[in-house]
């Protein structure tokens, strides 16, 4: 698998904020639709501020790409997760494991995939948006 990631705007010391992270979730969801992905698994990790038996704890769902942002917005409304959160992780994964878009716990974004359309599309979008982009192989 190949990885690309970003956590910074070029030439700035501040990391990505919640608005930038939400924009990248929307951008990735749009890219998924454009390349013909029909469904993805979206999830948020365990939130220690919620009771263990909360119906909102650790949400996970399989949705179409056009429902991705709505899933995360619902998690924000339910106080399970927040765009730009520094301690809680979330992700958008292929049900077959062929890619993972990871929203890290340090406001970092990582795409792991072998699909060059996804990697090239996000790399180009991030560079156009002025992000520092790192690349590595597993």
Annotate the PLM regions:
Residues 1-138:
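Structured alpha/beta or helical-core interaction and ligand-binding surfaces enriched in interleaved
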């Amino acid at each position: 698998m190949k990885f690309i990631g970003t956590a910074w705007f070029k030439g700035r010391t501040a990391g990505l904020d919640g608005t930038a992270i939400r924009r990248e979730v929307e951008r990735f969801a749009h890219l998924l639709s454009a390349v013909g992905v029909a469904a993805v698994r979206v999830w948020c990790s365990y939130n220690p501020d919620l009771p263990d038996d909360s119906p909102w704890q650790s949400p996970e769902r399989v949705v179409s790409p056009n429902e991705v942002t709505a899933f995360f917005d619902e998690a924000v409304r339910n106080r399970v997760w927040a765009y730009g959160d520094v301690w809680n992780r979330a992700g958008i994964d292929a049900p077959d494991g062929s890619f993972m878009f990871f929203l890290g716990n340090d406001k970092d974004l990582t795409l792991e995939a072998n699909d060059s359309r996804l990697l090239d599309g996000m790399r180009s979008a991030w560079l156009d948006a002025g992000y520092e982009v790192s690349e590595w192989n597993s």
